[in-house]
Amino acid sequence: MPKKAGATSKGKNQTKEPETPPPPTGPVATDSKGFVTIAIHAKPGSKQNAVTDLNTEAVGVAIAAPPSEGEANAELCRYLSKVLDLRKSDVVLDKGGKSREKVVKLLASTTPEEVLEKLRTEAEKK
């Protein structure tokens, strides 16, 4: 049976919720609680601390500490706090304590754009 002109359908399409924008792609994002998080690819055992590369998946960070007994994790948080001009207590390892792929959470009030800009500046220094 053909539809009448001007008739509205009572399907699921009528009650469409407003679309939420997709989460930002990139290494720096905001979690559900509003904290800024950074995806890190750690490279422990380097000669000096440095941001080596910034790509869409993670920030490559060379760490001048051995990957034993959490030394590299502590040095990573220390180095990132210096680069981002934050207190050491505001930079916390969230995930990846025994992995090279880590997530660092920033407890200070900052935006992902500011963090990305500071990381880019540090990466260009090498």
UniProtKB/Swiss-Prot annotation:
The keyword Transit peptide does not apply. InterPro entries: DUF167 (IPR003746), YggU-like_sf (IPR036591). The modification Phosphoserine is found at S89. It comes from the Eukaryota. Keywords: Phosphoprotein. Residues 1-33 are annotated as: Disordered. The keyword Transport does not apply. SUPFAM superfamilies: YggU-like. GO terms for cellular component: cytoplasm. Belongs to the UPF0235 family. PANTHER family: UPF0235 PROTEIN C15ORF40. NCBIfam families: DUF167 family protein. This is UPF0235 protein C15orf40 homolog.
